[in-house]
Regions:
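C-terminal catalytic histidine-bearing segment of alpha/beta-hydrolase fold enzymes
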Residues: 22-35, 39, 198, 206-210, ...
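Sec-dependent N-terminal signal peptides
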Residues: 4-13
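Primarily recognizes the serine-hydrolase "nucleophile elbow" in alpha/beta-hydrolase
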Residues: 148, 152-153, 159-204
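Gly/Ser-rich "nucleophile elbow"/oxyanion-hole loop immediately N-terminal to the catalytic nucleophile
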Residues: 75-82, 131-167
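Active-site machinery of serine-nucleophile hydrolases
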Residues: 84-86, 90-144
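A domain-start/cap signature at the N-terminus of enzymes
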Residues: 19-85, 166, 225-227, 236
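Loop/turn elements at helix/coil->beta-strand transitions in domains of secreted/extracellular proteins
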Residues: 82-86, 120-124, 157-161, 180-186, ...
Length: 265
């Protein structure tokens, strides 16, 4: 009798879980990774912190919104006949928390900083901050205003403005490329598949796009999207990073190769 009683209890609990929408247990099932939104900031490489300290804080204030950002200039070595180019970096979801420079303590900023310094490229890097409760799409006009201000103040070459984004920032990147296909010479977007975009606009900007192998439910779905982009005329470099999960792919996406892809446009 006790055996039947416990079987009855187990069946009741199981039905209760199904009624609440809980997924059944599957051995080996990989729980979904939270790609966007707020999440605790992880411990970062000390070198990333040192790089972040070399950036200068600034802000663009309007009656609607105050856009805070960090910026850094890089001096040209050799040929100084060209105007400086501009890199705009959109941070991930965790960057919306906090008030310090934690959100630029990232592999993207560090790798870009090291490359521009070693190569002696005349450039500026700017990293705006998206505040909690907003998305890059909702504050995009303020990002554009920031870019216009920097172009005027630092004599930026408007034909060489590059967009970079990680995770939540890459989702913002797809939105900005959809809104302003005329603005960016090229873009690198890491660890956020295109979901909401305007195809005929996005394909006008060359894109270097990466995803971690273990950050995809079905790789073939992503490849199908890339084929659609290319059929519509896109110049897109798509790389699956072997064996990497979401967080690993966010950090390892940025390389000399990806930066050189941007700079050749």
């Amino acid at each position: 009798m006790r055996r039947f009683y416990f079987l009855f209890i187990a069946l009741t609990l199981s039905l209760g879980c199904m009624a609440q929408g809980f997924p059944p247990y599957r051995s080996g099932h990989r729980p979904p990774q939270h790609r966007n939104g707020n999440r605790p900031m992880r411990e970062v490489n000390p070198e990333y912190k040192m790089t972040a300290e070399t950036f200068v804080a600034d802000s663009l204030v309007s009656s609607e919104y105050t856009l805070n950002y960090y910026k850094k200039q890089y001096a040209a070595v050799g040929d100084i006949s060209k105007k400086p180019c501009l890199f705009v970096y959109l941070h991930g979801g965790g960057g919306r928390d906090g008030k310090d420079n934690r959100y630029i303590q990232h592999a993207a900023i560090h790798t870009l900083d090291k490359y521009l310094t070693e190569k002696g490229i005349d450039a500026m890097v700017v990293a705006p901050k998206c505040t909690k409760g907003n998305s890059w799409a909702t504050i995009s006009k303020h990002v554009y205003s920031m870019i216009e201000s920097l172009v005027a103040d630092y004599n930026i070459d408007v034909s060489r403005i590059y967009l970079m984004g990680t995770s939540f920032g890459a989702q913002g990147g797809w939105a900005l490329l959809s809104e302003r296909p005329d603005l960016f010479a090229a873009a690198q977007l890491a660890s956020a598949a295109p979901k909401r975009y305007v195809l005929e606009n996005v394909v006008k900007t060359p894109i270097y796009f990466t995803l971690g192998e273990n950050d995809m439910d079905n790789p073939e779905d992503y490849k199908k999207t890339i084929r659609k982009f290319r059929k519509a005329g896109a110049e897109i470099e798509f790389k699956i990073l072997p064996g990497l999960n979401h967080f690993q792919a966010c950090n390892q996406a940025y390389t000399a190769e990806s930066i050189e892809f941007l700079l050749k446009h």
